[in-house]
Structures are given as structure tokens and as C-alpha cells.
């Protein structure tokens, strides 16, 4: 059985907060940290919208959630490294609040729900910090911009504010079964939503109609939060990588690019599909789709523990160059085109990024100042560890803003046939994105959303 394939059974257990805390503590100790120290984290505060009394949308701090599994706002936690004791502090009952919101979770209920050793109320935080047995001779680890003014670390010998954040970011890369199960569930729900959009596409009159279809399918499956703002781009709008207007009329455009994914218990899915709105590709759009699908198949098949992501990104460019040469859009020697980075005009972004609690998850070590334009926007660099989850999202785009400077450059334009290119502007862009778990000897694709040509066209035409 694949890892966490039985995700519903896995999710009957508790989020592994203590295992995460121990892993973070081990990282700190391995870097020379205090084995008798205490880790301290705060949840996000519930805030009001500016200039009114309505609550702003709440998003839990991921650093706090990773060591607690708790989505309650205004909470705190401590983890005592030597004793491996994890304590959660949640807001106490406030009678005025009960009138409006009902009774909050009690410490007893929290102890039952979360993977913690004890639960106190937020009134006890400072007293607990001062009473920790080893505090006078030990170190408190915290994230400086995430410590409330009323919190005091006065009883600790050392205050360390640099190690905790990178420790958590590093540990988040390698996923537990529970985390993989959450990502699988998010992918299952998002797949149902993508399929609903495909079925509704042929009669849609506006991009926003299809965005609404996606959101409805997620919410009715109790996935009320999106991992990011959906991209619903018809025709040439798909040439804009992060097009988010989602409000243009749909008339004679051939393709729709849908980049959308829901979130389940703070874990993201990130899926892109491009398909013909009426169920039939044009000659040009089909040719580009086949290139991108080939790019993705080859890159996914290259994945396993230890593979260098930069090299897989290069592979995507080489497959794109081969395909664009066959179509006549590019001309000349494939190796020269690769070396001179001409393919970046058509594939300007990175092949993918780590996925987890954030859509662009931590630990990727990107270099946005890289002088090599092929790698500047590659959000993950270096080798991929086992149990990391990476998005594989190759694309080919016809963006005038990006391509036209190449056509004005005497050295670069000789590799592009403008007369052939002219036929492809209306394609806009094609991107196909899956969420892939890296295993010791290969991979597991967590995204079951249809993408093969026959599968998507049959689905669209079935309505």
C-alpha cells in the first residue's frame, strides 16, 4: 500500500505534534543548542478588520501548528526539551464571549483532542515559564517577532531567537504519514472540484462562474479554506502566470487554465489543469499541451530520494526545447538554445516547489538573485529527501511581455521563428501541475485529477 493511501484511517489518529517537537529539538541540539532548553511558540491572534468590529479572516501560524496541531487563536505552547513535555495554553472561558460564540474548548477537551502532555489556560503562561524547573540555568527558544509584549523570559539564563524558525522550516520538509494523509485528502477534494469545473466549462459565460464552481465543490466537502487565490484564466489570460482577476467573459477562447487547490487542516493542495473549454483542442493548443504533458511525465518519472531538483528543472527545459523545435517555433541547435537560455522565454518559472502547510512551503532554499535566469525563480534547490512533497508544474506560455524582448535582441531572435510563433499567441499558456511524494526509490503521485488528453476531453464532453 502507498504511504497514507488509507488517509481517512490515518486521520482518525492525532496530529503528531510531539513527534514534530522532538524532531525540532533534535535539530537544535545537533546545532549545539541547549538540551535542557524550552521551546516557546504563540498562535496567531484573532484580529478585527481595520475600522470596524468584524473579525478578520483567521489563518493559524504554521510554526505554532507544526508543534501543536491546534487551530485555536490566541493560544501558546511550551516544549521542555529534556523531559519532552509539551504544554498547550488555550484561552479561558470569557462570559461575555460565550453570549455570542458559545462555550470554547475546555482544557480537558483539548487534552483529549491534541497530542500534548497537558493543557492550561493562557492566564498560566508566565507562571509556567517561571516555574519550569531548569529555567534558571537553561535557554528559551522563540521566534522574536512572535512573542507578545506581556510574556516574560526573565527566569531563563539565555534567550535564543535565531535557531527555532530555521529548525521548524527544515523539519517541515520531511512529512509524517499524518501530514501526507492531509495532503492526499486535500488533493481528493480538489480533484472533485477540478472535475466539476471541467463539466461546467462548456456553458460558462465568464471566468468567475467557474471559480464559483470550484469553491462550491470544496465547501460542500467541508474544505472551506483555499490554499491560495485561484487562477481561472481563459485564452491569452493564461500567459500571465499568477492571473487572479478571474472575471473576463468566455466566448471563443479555446483553453482554460485552472490553478486551484483547497486546504485541509492547514495543509495545502496545489493543482493546475489546462483543458479545452468546449472539449476539443485546436491544432496549436493540442501541440503545446502534448509538449507540456511530456515535460511533466518525464520529470515525475525522474524523481526519487536524492535527485537534484535543479537537474530535473533542466530536463523540463530540454523536453520543451525539443518540442518547440519540432513545431518550428524554435530553430537552430538544441544545445545552443539551452545554453543561451532561449527556452526561458516560453517557460519562465521554476518547475515546482515544496508543498505542505504553505503552498510555497519552507526549506526550498531558493536564490532569487541568481544571475542565471533559468534558475532564478526555482523555489526549491538541491537534492530532494525521501518523504518530501514537491509540485511538478511545467508550462509553456506565449506572453508578449516576456517574449517580445527576445525578438528585439539580435542574438536571441535568430532562434525564434516569428512567422510560426504568430499562430500560437492565442494559446495563451499551458501548465499541468501535480503534487508528488518523493520516496526512496521513486515517487507517489498524490494528485488523481484527470490530465491525459482522452480523459479530460471525455469528461468535458460527457455533460
Swiss-Prot record:
Its EC number is 3.4.11.9. Keywords: Aminopeptidase, Hydrolase, Manganese, Metal-binding, Metalloprotease, Protease. The keyword Membrane does not apply. Mn(2+) 2 binds at residues 259, 270, 433. Mn(2+) 1 binds at residues 270, 393, 433. Binds 2 manganese ions per subunit. InterPro entries: Aminopep_P_N (IPR007865), Creatin/AminoP/Spt16_N (IPR029149), Creatinase/aminopeptidase-like (IPR036005), Pept_M24 (IPR000994), X-Pro_dipept-like (IPR052433). The keyword Protease applies. PANTHER family: XAA-PRO AMINOPEPTIDASE 3 (PTHR43226), XAA-PRO DIPEPTIDASE (PTHR43226:SF1). This is Probable Xaa-Pro aminopeptidase pepP. It comes from Pyrenophora tritici-repentis (strain Pt-1C-BFP) (Wheat tan spot fungus). The lineage of its organism: Eukaryota, Fungi, Dikarya, Ascomycota, Pezizomycotina. The gene is pepP.
